Amino acid sequence: MLKIGKLAGAEMDISERIVNNFIDNEIGFVTTVPCKQLSGVIEAVEKHDQIHHVPCNHEAEGMGLCAGAFLGGTRPCIIMQNTALGVTINSLAALIQYYQMPLPMLISYRGEVGEKVACQVEMALHTIPILQQMNIPSYHFHKASDIEELSAILNHTFMASKPTAILADASFWSAA
């Protein structure tokens, strides 16, 4: 697959803007779990030679990969769905939080108004309470202009050495 450097220009789509924010904040490792809403970002990550992309099969596995990248001196990020947040609780608490590892988590926030898959709705009710219970800061992107906050959120995540959830809902992706 063709690898390219940082993209530029006014016509840049939201996925490219997200990846450029990753590069600007020196994120060099991204692991992803397949998600239809996040497919554009995953494709954009794959195109950049500044980012080592490792797809994974399970979000808890992705937490371990990110921990390894961080311990190896590379800033990590995981891209995942909120419906799998529950399976990452142990990895987040016992590994990422216990060892004070910064980890931005770009999470598709499935299950809100406009969701077409009924089974996604239940986890949407639990996503924010789980993050609050774990003391993980979360930011909810509803509209395309919310992307303007991403660089500051990433910078804060690495400064504070804590995981952070960036929840991007269907309205964010449809507005992009």
Give the predicted meaning of each segment.
Residues 2-176:
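Thiamine diphosphate
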